[in-house]
């Protein structure tokens, strides 16, 4: 087991609230919208689509409304039900429990209406609705030009393959046809989030994983002296959650930025790390030798990217304790009140982030 220095009582941890980290971003948005108003330009409009009268979804929608109002974004909630039919908590619970055979079609109609509405700039759908393939289907019919959550397959593919910049004309194109080939000759220290070349824009990332990245940037985990795209080099991070919504995308984002990431789930632990060079990448990782066609495809695809994407491999550690003890950053996302990361596992000066609705760390 890795030997690390344990936290000492004379060096208590420091608690940082996400609200303080978010404030500069909120101010920036508010200022930009203020400029648009001065120029008599339209204010961005976001539509939130609610499928069911479930308390968590309604609470999230109401929070979205307050957040938008605070910075000057126009926000509307589109519901599938008429409020006059749900007047109290008992009826709300009964309505939620009934099987609505029209629900998928109703949600789809609202999404299509928002897609067509030229006054709508962004669309947000409150999931889960059905779970599984039905929700995935609904995510794919949202116009990618209006998808503020980055759930469309186009954005998912870009995120996992480390494609950071796109041309608006590429939106909706098939995977493998959207690349950064025109940027390959540019210095990676010049092409970054603040210096996007003309004609390109940032690909949309899912909100919670991106929020975790912003938290890590704010506390100095990212090293700005290193080249953009490799500023987590030398850092070891444990992410305790591998959901398709947050945990897996987060592990991919962090490893694409150079970190060694231990991804811990309920029944397995895997390691996300930066993709190796072509020679190592083409080496067999199973009992089969890669075909010449696969090797050629790897080489062709690599040449079309500005930087490599991550790979997933077996983790050298077989238990979460060993992963946490070896980590500079520990990120908890377990939706269980009984799950706690023991303080004794966390090494001195490690950063801990909790994105679960429950407290995942001992206090």
Language-model features and meaning:
Residues 2-42, 49:
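Positively charged, low-complexity intrinsically disordered leader regions
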Residues 65-98, 261-265, 270:
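Short beta-strand elements in bilobed, periplasmic/extracellular small-molecule ligand-binding domains
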Residues 78-205:
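Phosphate/diphosphate ligand-binding glycine-rich loop within oxidoreductases
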Residues 51-69, 172-341, 351:
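Glycine-rich phosphate/diphosphate-binding loop of Rossmann-like nucleotide-binding domains
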Residues 33-44, 113-119, 230-231:
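Glycine-rich phosphate/diphosphate-binding loops that line cofactor/substrate pockets in enzymes
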Residues 126-132, 243-245, 335-338, 358-359:
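Short glycine-rich anion-binding loops that position phosphate/pyrophosphate groups of nucleotides
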């Amino acid at each position: 087991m890795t030997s690390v220095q344990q936290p000492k009582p004379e060096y208590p941890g420091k608690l940082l609230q996400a609200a303080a980290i978010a404030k500069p971003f909120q101010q920036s948005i508010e200022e930009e919208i203020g400029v648009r108003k001065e120029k008599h330009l339209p204010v961005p409009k976001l539509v939130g689509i609610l499928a069911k009268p479930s308390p968590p979804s309604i609470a999230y929608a109401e929070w979205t409304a307050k957040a938008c109002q605070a910075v000057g974004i126009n926000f509307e909630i589109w519901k599938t039900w008429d409020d006059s039919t749900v007047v109290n908590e008992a009826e709300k619970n009964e309505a939620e429990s009934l099987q609505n055979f029209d629900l998928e079609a109703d949600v789809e109609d609202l999404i299509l209406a928002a897609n067509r509405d030229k006054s709508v700039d962004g669309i947000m759908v409150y999931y889960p609705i059905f779970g599984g393939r039905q929700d995935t289907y609904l995510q794919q019919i949202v116009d990618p030009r209006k998808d503020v959550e980055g759930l469309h397959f186009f954005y998912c593919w870009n995120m996992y393959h480390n494609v950071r910049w796109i041309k608006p004309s590429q939106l909706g194109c098939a995977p493998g046809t959207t690349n950064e080939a025109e940027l390959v000759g540019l210095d990676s220290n010049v092409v970054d989030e603040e210096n996007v070349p003309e004609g390109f824009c940032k690909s949309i990332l899912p909100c919670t994983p991106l929020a975790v990245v912003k938290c890590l940037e704010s506390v100095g985990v990212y090293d700005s002296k290193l080249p953009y795209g490799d500023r987590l080099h030398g850092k070891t991070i444990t992410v305790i959650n591998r959901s398709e919504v947050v945990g897996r995308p987060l592990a991919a984002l962090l490893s694409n930025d150079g970190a060694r990431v231990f991804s811990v789930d309920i029944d397995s632990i895997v390691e996300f790390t930066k993709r190796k060079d072509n020679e190592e990448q083409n080496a067999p990782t199973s009992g089969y030798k890669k075909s010449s066609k696969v090797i050629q495809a790897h080489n062709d695809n690599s040449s079309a990217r500005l930087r490599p994407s991550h790979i997933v491999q077996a983790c050298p550690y077989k238990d979460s304790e060993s992963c946490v003890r070896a980590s500079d950053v520990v990120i908890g996302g377990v939706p269980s009140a009984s799950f706690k990361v023991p303080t004794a596992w966390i090494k001195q000066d490690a950063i801990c982030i909790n994105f679960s609705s429950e407290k995942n760390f001992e206090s």
